[in-house]
């Protein structure tokens, strides 16, 4: 939202995560919309940004589902080192940290960023 997006929708199954998004938006002085159900959202997004969905193999079908709601998807993940998907390309490896510091092992501070685009 701070980068100029017309609309930003924060979506998570966990109501506590949504509350965290609300608090973060307030701290940053931006307005967001919120959703607890990704699949109830229409196909209208230019970009879907997700993090930490690869840790559970049951989430892998979401990778294709993201492209049913948005033109592009960015996936950030620090857990899975051998991720491969025909639509997703690894853009790079980034250093990250959680704030406040949750004392995560250093290996989880390396985040891989993947990109996919809906076929035209």
Predicted feature residues:
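S-adenosylmethionine-dependent methyltransferases
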Residues: 1-120
């Amino acid at each position: 939202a701070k980068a100029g997006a017309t609309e930003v929708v924060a979506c998570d199954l966990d109501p506590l995560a949504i509350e965290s998004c609300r608090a973060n938006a307030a701290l940053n002085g931006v307005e967001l919309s919120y959703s607890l159900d990704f699949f109830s959202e229409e196909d209208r997004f230019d970009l879907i940004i997700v993090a930490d969905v690869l840790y559970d193999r049951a989430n892998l079908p979401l990778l294709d589902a993201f492209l049913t709601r948005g033109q592009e998807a960015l996936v950030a993940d620090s857990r899975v080192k051998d991720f491969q998907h025909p639509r997703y390309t690894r853009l790079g490896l980034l250093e990250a940290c959680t704030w406040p510091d949750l004392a995560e092992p250093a290996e989880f501070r390396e985040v891989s960023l993947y990109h996919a685009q809906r076929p035209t």
